[in-house]
């Protein structure tokens, strides 16, 4: 989709970047570097794609400072972080326009709920005593439970749920179907079955948290406690945060990953797809957990772990390499056994 053309020089100025080429060149859309045409702005953040500078038809490319232009190639905008700059430009060129404040006639808003300056769309429900900050956007089918608190400029997409008594900070985004504050998985085994443990705590999402579609952050079990997701954390689709868990600042959880109840993740922890942290574990700051790994033990700051159970990533790589050699090792071992047996038999007949 094309938009009003903008000079490359203006974009570079807003990004704090330097232009190599024509600052007057106009861009009117964004595209990938491999299929970009005239008028396109694209980006190059991975140096493996540098050869594409010689073939792309893009008008301008966001690049790292060390990237050199090619003859007859596109104009370059040198910035510190091309990927982040690309995200900013994408938001400028294709803004998501929020509707004006108001309550749709088919929405249900409790008389004592506070929704001043909020747009509440059709079939949304806002419970008694709930407070939603100005500039927030509540899409169709959203349920905000009684006594919930939501900060300013939040965006709750279709069919998201904020359960009673839960709290969302400013600029929180819940994608479609996300649930904050559902009951945690708590059952006491008995002779006759499983006795449900009432979940009477809450769930709290700090400022600038985004939760993907159909992800769940369960409420904690005990009154006065809360499951917490720290500022700026980003949760992908189909992510599970168990009751009473605590996530620090800037945590990233990729699709299908999960944190079991009462575990603590430090700041800037990354869980790759399908990674899991068992309950009552403490994970230090900056830890990265590889895809499909299971963390059984506490991890120190900065650890890089992979596997089941998760171990040091480099150790796991060596083990994985050794595992692929097992068929050859077994064949060599069988051959060695035959040779030893033959030698023993020859000795016995001497």
Each model region followed by its residue ranges:
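Structural signal for interior beta-strand "rungs" in well-ordered beta-sheet cores
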Residues: 43, 102-312
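Terminal amphipathic alpha-helical/low-complexity segments used for targeting or macromolecular assembly
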Residues: 1-106, 171, 177-178, 182-196, ...
């Amino acid at each position: 989709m094309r938009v009003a053309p903008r000079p490359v020089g203006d974009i570079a100025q807003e990004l704090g970047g330097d232009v190599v080429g024509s600052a007057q060149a106009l861009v009117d859309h964004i595209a990938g570097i491999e299929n970009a045409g005239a008028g396109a702005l694209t980006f190059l953040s991975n140096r493996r794609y540098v050869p594409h500078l010689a073939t792309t038809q893009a008008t301008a490319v966001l690049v790292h400072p060390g990237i050199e232009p090619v003859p007859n190639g596109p104009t370059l905008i040198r910035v510190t972080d091309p990927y982040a700059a690309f995200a900013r430009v994408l938001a400028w060129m294709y803004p998501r326009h929020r509707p004006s404040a108001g309550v749709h006639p088919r929405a249900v808003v409790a008389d004592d709920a506070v929704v001043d300056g909020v747009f509440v769309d059709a079939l949304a429900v806002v419970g008694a005593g709930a407070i939603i900050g100005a500039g927030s956007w509540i899409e169709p089918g959203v349920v905000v439970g009684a006594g919930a608190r939501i900060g300013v400029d939040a965006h709750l997409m279709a069919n998201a749920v904020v359960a009673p008594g839960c709290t969302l900070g400013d600029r929180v985004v819940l994608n479609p179907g996300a649930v904050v504050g559902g009951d945690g998985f708590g059952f006491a085994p008995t002779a006759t079955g499983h006795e449900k443990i009432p979940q009477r705590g809450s769930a709290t999402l700090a400022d600038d948290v985004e939760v993907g579609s159909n992800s769940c952050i369960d409420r904690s079990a005990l009154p006065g406690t809360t499951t917490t997701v720290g500022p700026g954390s980003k949760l992908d689709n189909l992510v599970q945060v168990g009751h009473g868990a605590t996530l620090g600042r800037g945590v990233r959880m990729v699709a299908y990953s999960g944190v079991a109840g009462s575990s603590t993740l430090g700041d800037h922890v990354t869980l790759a797809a399908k990674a899991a942290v068992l309950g009552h574990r403490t994970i230090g700051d900056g830890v990265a957990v590889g895809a499909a790994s299971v963390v059984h033990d506490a991890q120190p700051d900065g650890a890089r772990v992979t596997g089941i159970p998760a171990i040091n990533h480099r150790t796991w790589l060596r083990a994985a390499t050794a595992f692929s050699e097992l068929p050859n090792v077994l064949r060599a071992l069988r051959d060695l056994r035959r040779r030893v047996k033959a030698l023993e038999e020859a000795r016995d007949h001497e």
